[in-house]
Structures are given as structure tokens and as C-alpha cells.
Amino acid sequence: MKKLLFCAAMMLLLGLQALPVNAAAAAQPFVRWSVYSAAAGNENSLRAAVAALNTALQNSEGVLAVYGGEDENGVMRYLEIYTDETAFNAAQKSSNVKTAAAQALKLAQVHKTLAADAFNLQSKNAGTADKARMALLVIDPAQLDAYKKVLAKEMQSAVASEEGVLALLATTETARPNVFHLLELYADDNAYRAHIDGPYFQEYNKAVQTMVTDKVLIVNKPQAVTLSGKNLK
């Protein structure tokens, strides 16, 4: 089962050729996903190198957040959020980022970037999550507009009203706008389960039964994720 989930996730998120980075919709931050995995024996070195790269990015002007984690198969996925494409380009040209990126790429057996558009980025101002929870959802194109309304309502309500829900972040693939990548940050497992059992998710889940045609849940290892404190909207 684990192998099947890994293959599905890799096929959907990594199996794409590197896509050109395009600007997100107007008034939305610029986002992209970066994915890394190491050859056997290089795992710890790559973890350290990716951490250094993400720190360099977060210290760059115009970078709002870099959130992510490592799954049970050693694949690291990070959502990079910038104020706009200009900030993205400036960060990539930074000497600190270029040096850190070169080291990470040297150690990575696989490195992919996925062009994405920010759909909805809901976040509290402060907090630390136990890990990043991720999901990939494929939506029936004929029901895409209806799905977006249901998802946006659930995200906004949960982050505003549920104490342990720190951030719910949704992006869509630029090349396939009916494919959603979700990154969710909860204070702990109790907060996550309270959200799943709560009214907002239950209403959402009931409404989308015929809208979601495929779903992959990505299980990440425990890894503290601290909110950047920056406005993501």
C-alpha cells in the first residue's frame, strides 16, 4: 500500500517534466513547489542542504514563507511563497540562495519544480505545527467552480474559528488547473483530528463527494513548522 501511494504521489507531483514558472493570478502571491530526494547514503546531507537553502530563501526580501516536510519515503516537498514574480526572480539571483541551491542540487538525486498558482492561502499570524500534512486532489473539471467555492469556505472558516488550525494552503497546477495541492498545518494531531471531526470539514467532505475524482494523501514525518508571521494574502 505504501509503495502504491508513493508511486501515485511521485507520478502526480514528480513525474512531470520541470515546468516553466508562470505568474499566479492577479492579487495572489507567486508560488511554486520544489521537490527533492537523495541517493542512498546522502539523506542527512541533503536534509541539511535543503534546510540551508530554505533558510536563505526565507531571509530574502519578498519571500513570505517556505513550508513543507519529508515523507515516509524520503521525498522532501516544499511550497515556496513569494509576494510576486519579481520577488521570486530576485531571490533566485541572491548570492546566498545561489550558493545554497548549488549545494542542494549537488546532493539531490531527484529535484523537480512544479509551476503552481495560489488558490487560497489561509494562515494565522503565529504558531508552530507538528508537521506539514499534504494532499493532492484531482477535481472533475465540470464541477471545478463549485469545488472552489466549497473549499474556500472550509479553509477560511476553519483557520478563523478553530484554534489548532494554523494554516490551510491550496495551490493549483499551472498546467492542470483542476489539480490541487494542499498543505495543512495543525498545532498537533489532536487539532488535526478535531478539525476532521468538526463542522467545517464535515460540511466540505459531504459536498465534494462527486467532485473529487482522485486523491493522494502524503504522510510526512514529524517536523516542526513555524509560521513565518507574514501576511500571505
Predicted regions: what they are:
Residues A52-A65, I81-L114, V159-L166, L185-N220:
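An amphipathic, aromatic/His-enriched active-site/gating alpha helix that lines ligand/cofactor pockets
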Residues C7-Q17:
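Bacterial N-terminal signal peptides
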Residues N42, D84, D140-Q143, R176, ...:
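Acidic/polar helix N-cap motif
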Residues G127-L168:
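Surface-exposed interaction/gating patches
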Residues A23-V31, L64-M76, T99-L136, L166-N178, ...:
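Glycine-rich beta-strand-turn "strand-cap" elements at beta-sheet edges
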Residues V35-A48, V138-Y147:
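Short, surface-exposed ligand-recognition loops at beta-strand->loop->(often short) alpha-helix junctions
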Residues M1-L4:
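Positively charged n-region of N-terminal signal peptides that target proteins for export
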Residues V35-Y36, L53, V66-G69, L79, ...:
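A structural feature that tracks compact, well-ordered secondary-structure segments
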